[in-house]
Amino acid sequence: MSDIENYIGNTPLVLIDQIGSNKIYGKLEGNNPAGSIKDRPAIKMIKDAEKDGLIKKGDTLIEATSGNTGIALAMAASIRGFKMKLIMPETASIERVKTMKAYGAEVILVTKEEDMELSLIHI
């Protein structure tokens, strides 16, 4: 396990408010390494697929995405030793694309005329 994996899900629980004797707490999921709650399912999916023998280090993972799941998958794939291809709409923000690429993912942008899921057949 890489050091960064220790931080996925280990986010602070903070008191937000108290109404009478009831306390309201919130989890600061933005403190996950890739910045969202999506880090949890991303690392779990990859680790479960590894454990079940469906994927092995060095394989290329492919996902159609438009946001935080793609960023989390790019991070998780990188730290677990996988290549990652992410298919996104061309309208995706440049910040998202750059973040995914920073984790080593290949980002394939598709036009609105193309269907993201159908574009998987061209890879």
Model-derived regions, located:
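PLP-dependent amino-acid enzyme catalytic core
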Residues: 1-121
